[in-house]
């Protein structure tokens, strides 16, 4: 800070100076925030690539010992003792945040639900798997108001069990224990979620810059932007008052179906979660919501991480304000029963207002008067419902489902148990990752189950490699097929990958990105090799091994003898074990590694490349190495030559980087205006190469150019091959959770 500017004259941290002079900062304001307050190059160039999402959860910010392994540590947990401690917390009301009805169970259910409920199936991001509810923005979402208190109530438990229990596991396990303590039988629980130590900044939560804004995520009639799932910024699912606060139950049902569907739930699962969840507890709106203080991230230091301080009355208990709605659904709010549906269908309902002015519903003609207990004082009142609750009654599909449960509560219990388990575990990956004594024996289609594979001897691997090498399949076919299979992996929810051999099944066999006609030929050839070999090898292993053969051939053509690491043991799933609708979300709409950009992309191709690399769990150097290598291996979608900057395609050379950075080439946009570029000889004007935005970004973006320069250097040829093989193997093995 300049010495002639008194510190008291500076704007507060987090605020920008608004009186920017003409011709000032190109970002539109006159004073950039310091780095410690969030200032960055993005303030100057807001449209630049965010390379930091390729540096997720680095070791340098992890306070645990370098050799600490949570998945081993959690297996030392005394789960019975943990359960008892959570139960004790639930039954011990604290004056600083008194328990509704003397039981924190409903609060813990909401905490677990809102942690897991951020998951969206389109990109696999969100969910409870990393304990993100502790960090911004989720810890400060309006829909998560008061969940800061739930986590603070559990701090003594976390403190006691230390590193053997992650916050990610504790947050959702507390909700599971709460259900069971109130009489519900869950389907079980799996431990194994590892905490991270910084917010996930690779998740796009929406375009809005104000809480509860809903003006920018919809187009047309009510088309919600992908990959978003919630209807408003800062909500988990839908607006409980109805769309945009309009108390229309039928319109609410439309939002519910869309939102829960984007979170991987069908109609039965959706109805079960709403009915089951709203069997317990209450909402809080007994006062003027506009008087509530700022959320945790904006609260003053003395609040020590808590937010939403309420100055009205005691500020807690009967005076608590969370959503502004004041609803208790049933007369048994801490007990599992069928009373939610009995009350929903046992009354006609009329619109009313909460003390905070929110739209909610009460029984007509004073129905069920004095039947529902007050949470913090003697006396009783009537039940209430949300607009989103009445949606279950007015929507014909939801009504058919829930009316049956009214007469068959055992079916509701079964469906809620399954849906709740799915909610908590959807982002954990396959059942082989489930840990602990409460893992259920049952499995479900949504878990993408894969039969166990077989081990292979060194001799068997050698024979298979020889058969593949002599099969007539080209380096391009071998490498591209393995890449198509393995690169479906998503580190976000641990779905996809080569394991399972689903590249030969629908829907993957028919995806445009996979070039179905050519892929079908390669699949047939692999099936012939599989049969002719006489070896009990899975199709999945064969595809990866074939990719390795292609890489080894390409390295040899570049003058290097390498052996690409191969770990057998992949299994083959069947079509019956594959949920076609669910797997459709894994279809790549863009794959910059193969210069593929599908129709209707919402972002430029280079941004899609970074996003895909992030989902694959790649670092920026790994991404750079793979793009450069795959270009010279000639694996582009459709056989295009964009970015194939070599006269030796099929050889694993550094030619992509050398020729991209060669200043004798001048680049200009193609007159076809199709997002491609033409590289011409500066001296003669003769065309030399063509490229895409993904190709040119490695020369244009300063960070990527720095990486490209490393591999273009004369002494990097061997290093490039070594680094490519390492990055390739990482992708091939990304879904091998059975391999250390």
UniProtKB/Swiss-Prot annotation:
Molecular functions per Gene Ontology: catalase activity; heme binding; metal ion binding
Top-level taxon of the source organism: Bacteria
Binding site for heme b: 278
Record-listed E.C. numbers: 1.11.1.21
Keywords for this protein: Heme, Hydrogen peroxide, Iron, Metal-binding, Oxidoreductase, Peroxidase
Reaction equation(s) it catalyzes: H2O2 + AH2 = A + 2 H2O; 2 H2O2 = O2 + 2 H2O
Gene Ontology process terms (BP): cellular response to hydrogen peroxide; hydrogen peroxide catabolic process
GO cellular component, one term: cytosol
Function (record text): Bifunctional enzyme with both catalase and broad-spectrum peroxidase activity. May play a role in the intracellular survival of mycobacteria.
Protein name: Catalase-peroxidase
Lineage: Bacteria, Bacillati, Actinomycetota, Actinomycetes, Mycobacteriales
Gene giving rise to this polypeptide: katG
């Amino acid at each position: 800070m300049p010495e002639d500017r008194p510190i008291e004259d500076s704007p507060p941290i987090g605020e920008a100076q608004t009186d920017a002079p003409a011709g000032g900062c190109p970002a539109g304001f006159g004073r950039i925030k310091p780095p410690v307050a969030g200032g960055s190059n993005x303030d100057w160039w807001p449209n630049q690539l965010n390379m930091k999402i390729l540096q997720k959860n680095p070791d340098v910010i992890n306070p645990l010992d370098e050799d600490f392994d949570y998945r081993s540590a959690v297996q030392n947990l005394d789960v019975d003792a943990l359960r008892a401690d959570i139960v004790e917390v639930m039954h011990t009301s604290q004056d600083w945040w008194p328990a509704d009805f003397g039981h924190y169970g409903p609060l813990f259910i909401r905490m677990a639900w809102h942690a897991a409920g951020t998951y969206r199936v389109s990109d696999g991001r969100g969910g409870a798997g990393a304990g993100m509810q502790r960090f911004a923005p989720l810890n400060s979402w309006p829909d998560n108001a008061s969940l800061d208190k739930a986590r603070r109530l559990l701090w003594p438990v976390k403190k006691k069990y230390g590193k053997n229990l992650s916050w990610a596991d504790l947050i959702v396990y507390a909700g599971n224990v709460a259900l069971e303590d109130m009489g519900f039988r869950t389907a079980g629980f799996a431990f194994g979620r590892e905490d991270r130590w910084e917010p996930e900044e690779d998740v796009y939560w929406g375009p809005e810059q104000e809480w509860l804004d809903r003006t920018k995520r919809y187009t047309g009639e009510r088309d919600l932007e992908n990959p978003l799932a919630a209807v408003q910024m800062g909500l988990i699912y839908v607006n409980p008052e109805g769309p945009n606060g309009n108390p229309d139950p039928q319109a609410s049902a439309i939002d519910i179906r869309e939102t829960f569907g984007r979170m991987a739930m069908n109609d039965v699962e959706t109805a079960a979660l709403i009915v089951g969840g709203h069997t317990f507890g209450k909402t809080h709106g007994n006062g003027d919501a506009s008087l509530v203080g700022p959320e945790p991230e904006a609260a003053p230091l003395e609040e020590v991480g808590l937010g939403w301080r309420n100055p009205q009355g005691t500020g807690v208990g009967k005076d608590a304000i969370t959503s502004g709605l004041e609803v208790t659904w049933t007369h048994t709010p801490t007990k599992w029963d069928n009373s939610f549906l009995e009350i929903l269908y046992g009354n006609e309902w009329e619109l009313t207002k909460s003390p905070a002015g929110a739209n909610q519903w009460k029984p007509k003609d004073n129905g069920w008067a004095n039947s529902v207990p007050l949470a913090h004082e003697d006396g009783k009142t009537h039940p209430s419902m949300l607009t989103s609750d009445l949606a279950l009654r007015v929507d014909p599909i939801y009504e058919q489902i829930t009316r049956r449960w009214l007469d068959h509560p055992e079916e509701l219990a079964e469906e809620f148990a399954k849906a709740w388990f799915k909610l908590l575990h959807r982002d954990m990956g396959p059942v082989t990752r489930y840990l602990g004594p409460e893992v259920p024996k049952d499995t479900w289609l949504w878990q993408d189950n894969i039969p166990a594979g077989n081990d292979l001897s060194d001799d068997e691997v050698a024979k298979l490699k020889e058969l593949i090498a002599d099969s007539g399949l080209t380096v391009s076919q071998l490498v591209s097929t393995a890449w198509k299979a393995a690169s479906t992996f998503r580190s976000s929810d641990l779905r996809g990958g080569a394991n399972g051999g689903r590249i030969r099944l629908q829907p993957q066999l028919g995806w445009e990105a996979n070039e179905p006609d050519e892929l079908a030929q390669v699949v047939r050839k692999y099936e012939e090799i599989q049969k002719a070999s006489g070896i009990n090898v899975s199709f999945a292993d064969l595809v990866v091994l074939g990719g390795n053969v292609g890489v080894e051939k390409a390295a040899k053509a570049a003058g290097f003898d390498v052996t690409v690491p191969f770990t057998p043991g992949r299994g083959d799933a069947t079509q019956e074990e594959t949920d076609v609708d669910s797997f459709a979300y894994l279809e790549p709409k863009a794959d910059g590694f193969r210069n593929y950009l599908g129709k209707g992309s919402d972002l430029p191709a280079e941004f899609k490349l970074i996003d895909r690399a992030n989902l694959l769990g790649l670092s920026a150097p790994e991404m750079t190495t793979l793009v450069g290598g795959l270009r010279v291996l000639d694996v582009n979608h459709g056989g295009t030559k964009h970015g194939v900057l070599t006269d030796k395609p099929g050889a694993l050379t550094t030619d992509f980087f050398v020729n991209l950075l060669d200043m004798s080439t001048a680049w200009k946009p193609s007159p076809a205006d199709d997002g491609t570029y033409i590289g011409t000889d500066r001296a003669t004007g003769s065309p030399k190469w063509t490229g895409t935005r993904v190709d040119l970004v490695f020369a244009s973006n300063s960070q990527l150019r720095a990486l490209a320069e490393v591999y273009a250097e004369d002494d990097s040829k061997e290093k490039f091959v070594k680094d490519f093989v390492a990055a390739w193997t990482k992708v091939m093995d990304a879904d091998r959770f059975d391999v250390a």
